[in-house]
A protein has these predicted regions:
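Short, conserved loop/helix-junction motifs that constitute active-site signature segments
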Residues: 83, 103-106, 180-186, 215
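Active-site flanking residues adjacent to catalytic metal/cofactor-binding acidic residues
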Residues: 91, 113, 163-165, 191
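Rossmann-like AdoMet/SAM-dependent catalytic core
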Residues: 23-82, 96, 142-159, 195-286
Length: 286
């Protein structure tokens, strides 16, 4: 009996010791993994990642793509289908606002939000600024998309809208918390997604899958632009830029099943003057 008890105690001690050693190794190697873009978390198999990317293959929009905004960073490609869109909601105010300026010059009301700045760099009679971060809830310096839209357009619950969002990783919780009825009002959605290089991390992969589950209910991807601010990583033969700019269009405005063939649109421009990034064929239905 005594020997059994000692044996069991030894097992417990060894199990605890192994757990502590694994924890120490994880903590020590995690910064190294962050630097070299690998993770110690549970990994996703390449076929699952390819399946997700396959859902994101761009289809052709009914109207041709045009470029709105400046050359380089801050300019985006979206369909030439802006007539009838009453307002653009643009969370995340940077030093660059020419995308918003050009839309305002076309007669669109522009609603901007960001707690980190006092006001947009440029002024325009159609600009309406809210000093709040946009996120999952209404609390403190945060406001949800539904609350923001309802307060901005209190007498309009049906008009088409445009969403342009670059909020440094908060796009995920913002999309999750947005009502489907509001999401459906956005004829055009332009989002920069961050941390795409984590697509092989199991938890992030689940989050990414669920985000696009929601976005693709009534929208389709029509354009993907890799932001070349950081270099592309390659895992299991799959190229993944950390930052990807997606243009999505409501399904009544696309040619369903007609996929884009060109990997780089003639109007695409590098965000910064570094090495060019071109997405590989895996990102397109060829």
């Amino acid at each position: 009996m005594l020997s059994n008890s000692i044996f069991k105690l030894g097992e417990v001690i060894m199990t605890d010791l192994k757990t502590k050693i694994r924890s120490l190794i994880y903590k020590a190697l995690t910064p190294v993994g962050d630097y070299f873009h690998f993770s110690l978390d549970f990994r996703v198999y390449a076929p699952a990642v390819k399946t997700l990317i396959g859902r994101l293959h761009p289809v052709e929009s009914i109207k041709p793509l045009i470029r709105i905004g400046p050359d380089g960073d801050g300019g985006y490609l979206l369909p030439d289908d802006l007539e009838g869109i009453v307002a653009c909601f643009s969370p995340g105010v940077d030093v660059e606002s020419r995308f918003e300026m050009q839309l305002a010059d076309r007669g669109m009301e522009l609603f901007l939000a960001d707690y980190s700045v006092e006001k947009p760099r440029f002024d325009h009679p159609r600009f309406h600024f809210t000093k709040k971060y946009i996120g999952a809830m209404d609390h403190g310096v945060f406001m949800s998309m539904d609350t923001w839209v309802n307060k901005s357009l209190p007498n309009d619950a049906h008009s088409d809208l445009l969403l342009q969002m670059d909020i440094e990783g908060f796009e995920y919780e913002t999309i999750f918390s947005m009502s489907q009825s509001l999401l459906n009002r956005f004829r055009i959605i332009v989002i920069e997604f961050h941390s795409f290089e984590r697509i092989f991390d199991k938890q992030f992969f689940k989050q990414l899958n669920r985000v696009f589950d929601k976005l693709l209910v009534n929208h389709s991807v029509v354009h993907i632009h890799p932001n070349n601010y950081e270099k592309t990583i390659v895992v299991k033969g799959i190229d993944v830029p950390p930052f990807l700019e997606f243009t999505l269009v409501r399904n009544d405005k696309v040619h369903a099943g007609k996929y884009v063939k060109k990997r780089r649109h003639p109007l695409d421009q590098d965000n910064v003057p570094l090495k060019k990034i071109e997405l590989s064929p895996i990102w397109y239905r060829e």
